[in-house]
Amino acid sequence: MTENLQSESIPHEILPKEPFDLPMNNLKSSPKNKDSEKRINNSIAESEQVVDSALSNPETNANEDIIAPQLPSQNSEIIEKNSPVNKLNSSTSLTTHQLASLPKLEVTDHDNVSEAETVVLNEDEEKETSLVGSVSVTEDLGDSSAIGRTILVNNSVEPQMENTANITIVSPSLKESDFESEEKATNDNNGLIETNHNSKLEESSEHEEEEDEESNIERTEDSDHQIPQRGGTLEAPRKGGPRSGVGSRKRKRATVSRKWSTNSESKIKRVALETSQEESDREIADRRSASEQAHEADDEKAIKRKEAFDALLNIETEFTFLRNRLYGKKLLKLNEHEEMIQNETHERFNACIDLITERRDDRVRLATENLMKQLGNIKNVMDYVTKQRKYQLLFDKRRIRQALLTKIATKCFQLLNKQKSVHDPTYITQKTMSYRQSALLQKQRIEYEAAVLCELNSFAGFPTAPIIETASFDDIRNDLLEMGCLSENQD
């Protein structure tokens, strides 16, 4: 029932924004409103009595199937089609059109709601089913969002309170501000459904298991003292007390076996539902944890980067202050040194200048000495060259003179030889001499000439030079000037 109501919740757009246009005094004073309030109170009292009777007699018929308590999110899968619970839910479930038409109507429409509830209760009494569907009447008065009283029809023995869209019956004593709070509360309730769903599933499953165990124990112990049910109707106790015999024992065993089988099936279904829900919860938790860890890691990285940037900025600012101070000190020192240099009072600068001047003087002195030595070497080379040229000139003159003298001497010797041959009688008589005599004479003459030449070889002027006339003083002076022995200034 809760699933149907939750799926077919009334949209906020259908609800009227200002449902109380009429004054409140007129609503309270109208007899129709009073009658509708009385009917609503009577229907609520009847439903509470039915719930109390169902809770006081938690027995199931042996011929009917036992239906396990169902979770509100899984009702449609567990309820059988032919079970009376499904019929009851189908009879009590309202469509979207009916739910949409409820708030549009005024207070007079509460009569229809109360009649529907009475019809449901009458059908339940006619079928005479026990523990098929328990009607739970709740009043959501804790929050300002729950306006009016809500009537829920559930399949479980224990009423399950959830923040779902229920059938609301508006009381005429409410104000316009309650509708605004209702809209806010519906949004809050829809957000809280997911968070409370897992905890309620666990609590309901544990509570139902405990109730099943207690009910099984009580049924096995008090089965002889309880009144059996047949065909969904209650029977009066017999005068003879509880039944005895083989038939009653068989029935007891059959009921116990059916109870255990239904309990085992319900437990299996519960375990399957719990495992599936736990797996889905674990997956969601893992995803959330992974995403949260990633977000936390990103946040930590961003925080660390921010801290690092702040630290770098502080370091840079401090470094700029220190740098400016150092540069200021350096500039002051440089200005002081400049003044000292201009005033020629800087000790280190003066010492450096003295060293530079000393080294400069040494280099100049060495350069001058080297230059003088180079000049002296050049002079010596020139003297050597000039003297060599003079000696070469003298040698060439002597060689030329000797060559000329040899030529002249040969010519003179030839002339004298011709003269001798002309005036020498032996030369004349050679023609009359025999060949032997002429050969001997020629041999003697050659030997004589050779002996003369050998004697003259030891004397200068060989061969014998001719007599030359005496040269004048000017000729001798010119010759000496050309030879370089005399200069023009010298006489």
Curated annotation (Swiss-Prot):
SMART domains: Sds3. Keywords: Chromatin regulator, Nucleus, Phosphoprotein, Repressor, Transcription, Transcription regulation. Residues 1-74, 155-301 are annotated as: Disordered. Residues 205-215 have a biased composition (Acidic residues). Residues 54-63, 155-171, 187-196 have a biased composition (Polar residues). The modification Phosphoserine is found at S204, S223. One of its GO terms (cellular component) is nucleus. The keyword Nucleus applies. GO terms for biological process: negative regulation of transcription by RNA polymerase II; transcription initiation-coupled chromatin remodeling. It is found in: Nucleus. One of its GO terms (molecular function) is histone deacetylase binding. Component of the RPD3C(L) histone deacetylase complex (HDAC) responsible for the deacetylation of lysine residues on the N-terminal part of the core histones (H2A, H2B, H3 and H4). Histone deacetylation gives a tag for epigenetic repression and plays an important role in transcriptional regulation, cell cycle progression and developmental events. Component of the RPD3C(L) complex. PANTHER family: BREAST CANCER METASTASIS-SUPPRESSOR 1. This is Transcriptional regulatory protein dep1. It comes from Schizosaccharomyces pombe (strain 972 / ATCC 24843). The gene is dep1.
